[in-house]
């Protein structure tokens, strides 16, 4: 039987790369006819993924990485209006190089005695411009959405509203009714790029979704039944494959750059804490706060009386990933470290998030509501208090609280970079609430965690969905 090669083009950045790597590993585990080529576009922003991808390539002979050459003339960041536009236009500049690489792959497979065919191009949200390459080479294209079905519903609806000139994004405007999302969505929880008037990049991306042969989504039927059922009954939407949770359960332990001593210190401290007694604060690879907000968080934690593990990152120059704090005493209230650090709490920089969420001492999570973090918290049965910051995180937080009842509302509409400072009392209330032992939110999260584990096992909904995707790809070859 013919072997098939799938070419993946993920967006740069951990939130896109890591789910892609986990998904392709799942594909090759399921079918020995499949091999994977990942076209690696260097990030516009500094990242720490290269060592991890190299370790994957070394350990998985059917996964290879090809670096896409950088364009000679890279427009300066100041030319772009939004992060979405930076990503999409920067990636568009790689189209000629990607076309050349895939053309060579197709040509070499046609001339090879190994009988391996390039069967599909799988692109990320910000890489939909590569669909044109697939069309030119007569290769089916699929979208791999590392976010959720609700976000897919939003993106599919966006071009429709644009055509009707019905996009209203001022906070005073009426709520949006979006097919696939149960409750009307207030404009204040829409992605910041929309409410700031930077709409064109999102519409350009969203308008390409329906051109694909199928859409793979990092979710599972039991979590987002409403949206997935709607997609399956809509002939205008390509087949949707809910394959999640696709999460890095190894927590990137293969990263050579991760500080093993830091990890050991964190886990040893957690080992000494009572079961479900620690609230974990972590805000993603791009999440950080200024000094005033850091002090309010510290006061709120101390007032709450709860044990805490706080991944504290400080802002860096625009476009640079936040860094660990070099001098905690400068940004924390006087005496805070002496009163809490190592006793009631532990402050760190980088933290092994999945390992922390899996630890029996962890009882709650104050999170930015990135989709990977939400899936990891559900998997391990740890409830979230919402503190969204950027991208679609406000919409994620809104749906987790209002639609699914699986998160505690602290803020739904906070946006990174705003002058808004969340006060200590509000933080205290959220921390105490998310740590409540017998709350309805905790019960729902723990039950959904069990469903998530069933979904990816043989006989589960996501296991079946991965099988359907493989059949669709192989069936054409």
UniProtKB/Swiss-Prot annotation:
Keywords per UniProt: Glycosyltransferase, Transferase
GO molecular function: UDP-glucosyltransferase activity
EC category: transferase
UniProt-listed Enzyme Commission number(s): 2.4.1.-
Entry-linked CDD domains: GT1_Gtf-like
Temperature characteristics of this protein: Optimum temperature is 40 degrees Celsius.
Family matches, as InterPro entries: UDP-glycosyltransf_plant, UDP_glucos_trans, UDP_glycos_trans_CS
pH dependence per the entry: Optimum pH is 6.75.
Pfam families: UDPGT
Disulfide bridge positions per record: none
Transmembrane segments: none
Positions of UDP-alpha-D-glucose binding: 285, 350-351, 368-376, 390-393
Protein purpose: Glycosyltransferase that possesses chalcone and flavonol 2'-O-glycosyltransferase activity. Converts phloretin to phlorizin (phloretin 2'-O-glucoside), a potent antioxidant. Possesses glycosyltransferase activity toward quercetin, isoliquiritigenin, butein and caffeic acid.
Family the entry assigns: Belongs to the UDP-glycosyltransferase family.
UniProt name for this protein: UDP-glycosyltransferase 71K1
Species assigned in the record: Malus domestica
Phylogenetic lineage: Eukaryota, Viridiplantae, Streptophyta, Embryophyta, Tracheophyta
Gene (name only): UGT71K1
């Amino acid at each position: 039987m013919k072997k098939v090669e799938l070419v993946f083009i993920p967006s740069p950045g951990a939130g896109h790369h890591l789910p892609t790597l986990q998904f392709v590993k799942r594909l090759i585990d399921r079918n020995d006819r499949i091999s994977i080529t990942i076209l690696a576009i260097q990030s516009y922003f500094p990242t720490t993924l290269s060592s991890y991808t190299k370790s994957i390539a070394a350990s998985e002979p059917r996964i290879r990485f090809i670096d896409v050459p950088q364009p000679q003339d890279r427009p300066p960041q100041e030319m772009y209006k939004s992060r979405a536009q930076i990503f999409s236009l920067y990636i568009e500049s790689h189209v000629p190089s990607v076309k050349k690489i895939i053309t060579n792959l197709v040509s070499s497979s046609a001339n090879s005695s190994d009988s391996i065919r390039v069967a599909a191009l799988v692109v990320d949200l910000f890489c939909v411009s590569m669909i044109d390459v697939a069309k030119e080479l007569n290769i089916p294209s699929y979208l791999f959405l590392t976010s959720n079905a609700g976000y897919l519903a939003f993106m599919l609806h966006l071009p429709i509203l644009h055509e009707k000139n019905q996009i209203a994004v001022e906070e005073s405007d009426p709520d949006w009714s979006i097919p696939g999302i149960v409750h009307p969505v207030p404009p204040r929880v829409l992605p910041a790029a929309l409410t700031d008037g930077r709409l064109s990049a999102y519409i350009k991306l969203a308008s390409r979704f329906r051109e694909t042969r199928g859409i793979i989504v990092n979710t599972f039927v039991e979590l987002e039944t409403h949206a997935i059922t709607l997609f399956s009954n809509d002939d205008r939407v390509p087949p949707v494959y809910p394959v999640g949770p696709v999460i890095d359960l190894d927590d990137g332990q293969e990263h050579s750059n991760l500080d093993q001593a830091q990890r050991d210190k964190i886990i040893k401290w957690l080992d000494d804490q009572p079961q479900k007694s620690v609230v974990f604060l972590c805000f993603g690879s791009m999440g950080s706060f200024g000094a005033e907000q850091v002090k309010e968080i510290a006061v709120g934690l101390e007032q709450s009386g709860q044990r805490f593990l706080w991944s504290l990152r400080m802002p860096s120059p625009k476009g640079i990933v936040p860094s660990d704090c070099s001098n905690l005493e400068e940004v924390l209230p006087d005496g805070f470290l002496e009163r809490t650090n190592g006793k009631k709490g532990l402050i760190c920089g980088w933290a092994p998030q999945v390992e922390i969420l899996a630890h029996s001492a962890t009882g709650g999570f104050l999170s930015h509501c990135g989709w990977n973090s939400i899936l990891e918290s559900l998997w391990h049965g740890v409830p979230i208090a919402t503190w969204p910051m950027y991208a679609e995180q406000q919409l994620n937080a809104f749906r987790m609280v209002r639609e699914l009842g699986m998160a505690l509302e602290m803020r739904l509409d906070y946006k990174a970079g705003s002058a808004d400072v969340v006060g200590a009392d509000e933080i205290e209330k959220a921390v105490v609430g998310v740590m409540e032992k017998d709350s309805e939110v905790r019960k729902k999260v723990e039950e959904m965690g069990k469903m998530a584990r069933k979904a990816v096992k043989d006989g589960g909904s996501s296991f079946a969905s991965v099988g359907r995707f493989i059949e669709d790809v192989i069936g054409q070859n």
